Structures are given as structure tokens and as C-alpha cells.
Amino acid sequence: MKNNSFDFLLAFLSEHKNIFVHTDITKAVNFKFEKGFFLKKHLDFLSKNLQDSNLFFPSFNYDFLKNQVYNIENDIIQVGILNEFIRVNYSKFRSSTPVFNFISLDEPSDYKDQNTSLINPFDRTSIFHYLYESNSAYFHYGSDFSTTTLIHYVESMRTNLIYRYIKCFNGKIKSRNAKSSVSLLYHVKPMNFYQKYDWSKIESDIDRQGLLFKFESGRTELKAFNVKNVVDFWLKSLSIAPLYFLDDKSRINVLNKINIENTQLNMSDFE
């Protein structure tokens, strides 16, 4: 049986070259609140205990989908106050992908941020593929398992994804010295159509496989896994059951929508 102690989790994480860290300080390590120092305590904890790994933090901002502009330097992070604190005060790098970008304390040494005018945030040029190809861990530092964006990378690797469709969002990327026109292309779920992931099953399945490492005490919930091991397990599960990620009601909805002539959902069916 896996050891679910705090030290065992940190030891597991420290084995990895890269760690992608989702954060929610309401369920992270329980530090005493001190105004002006609280967020720094969390960053210091991560930096000290994972000092031999490269730490990446999601810096997602969804405004590009509405206003067609991604400003690399100025767009705030919409997925965690700790992440935004790091961006404003300590980050030295932010990736150029609209919506699904990330920050790091130092510029990555071997990840190449080379977006073209046509961007798929989950393809083989993405940070998620880099994590898959390198020795990387995915760490939920208090964040809910349902924030595992890696699931969309797995879906993008499937050639027969039948419950989402590809949509293109045109816009511009702005930085201090440049502006470029781009098209963001990725799979989206249908509007006004019930479709939800079965996160409880997804999490419990990788736990039963011995792939999930966690520490839970009081309100603290820390969870981690090796990216490649979990991606490979999910790909195998999808090859057996293409609707594996979905809950029961969603699977029924999708199966009722498609037919012999229409073997997957299309944008024209909903927009």
C-alpha cells in the first residue's frame, strides 16, 4: 500500500525534473495568516521543498475568448491568487499561448515557446506535451482534482474524440515589443448541452492504479501524479471506452445526439 504521508508526497514530487502546480490556498498547507506575508509563505514552502525541480504555474486567462486579445505582460491570472501573486512579484517568464498559458520563476531552459499563427494549446508543441515527454509531475497544491487541465491534452491526442468539436478563436497576442494575429484552435464542449466529466471516477481510478500520491489532513488536500503514467492510463482507457471521461448522463446525451451519419458532435449541431 502507498504511503500517503506528507514526506512521502514531497519525496515523490522531488523525483521529477518539472512540476506543474495548480493552487488553491484554501486547502493548501495550513499557514497562520499574516497580512503581507501569507502568500509569500506558500511560495517559500514550494520553492524550498521542491528546489531541485522546475516549477510551472498555470496563468490561465479566458478573456481572449471574448475580447480577442491576450496581453502577455498585463493580463491577470484567473486561476488562483497565489499564481497571480507570483506573476506580479517573482515570475520571469509567461508563455505566449492565449488562454492556457503558464508562468515560471525562471525562463525554462529546454521548453521552446514557439507559437505560430495557428495555435492549438494542447498539441505536440504545448507545455502539456513537454510535460509528457519530460520527467514531470502534476501537483494539486490544495486545488480540486477537477482542475486537471491535462485531460484536454489527452483528448487532443485522440483521433476519434466524439463528444467535443473543434472551434477557432481569432485574435491578437500583445507583448511589450510586438503584436501578432493568431487563431486559437481547440476542442470545446457544446453550448447548452449537458456534458460533464465524472471527476470522482477519474480520480478514484488512478488512485486504484497506484498512480495518485496524496496527503490529506484537516482542510489540507495535496495530490500529485506522474504526467506520463497517468496520460498513458487515460489513453488506454479511452481506447477501450471513448466516453470514459464522461458521467452517465453525459454519455447518454452524446449517444442520443450522434447517429450513423453523424459519428461525432459538430459545431453546426449547436452554433
Give residue spans per PLM region.
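N-terminal and secondary-structure boundary signal
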Residues: 1-271
